[in-house]
């Protein structure tokens, strides 16, 4: 068929590896929501594409969490945490998020984080990011879940950040596939992020 189902085998394998002390940053809510909607209605949503994406994300997030809960070891709690860029750009929200994540291992819980696409308006996000930059601050944009994962890793001082991806590396020029950088390194995660940012400028 034109629309395939989600790959439960991949999610099951990942879920069974999760333990308290791990922080999992996931993606796929929009795509899963679209599949779920089509499965129930026989066709995709019509109308405004951006509105459809937010509607799919809202529908897919619940399916995604149900699926993780199904496969994560039943001894462990699963906690849904939806973030947006302001959670990293506001000191009070950063501290609240950090404290919550650090409580999880003590409470036998696995936090599963996703960017809150269902209520995130791209136009508003850009305006807020520009205001931070104009005031001389360093704005964390969270343009994708890889960046979100790296910010989470810095926030809780993870020993290891593992990004699972189907891409071969980072394109220093998104328009030129020959600009592929297969390896970026740093003595710690902060230096690594600086080196990644330099590549993207």
Please describe what each predicted stretch is.
Residues 1-201:
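Nucleotide/pyrophosphate-binding catalytic subdomain
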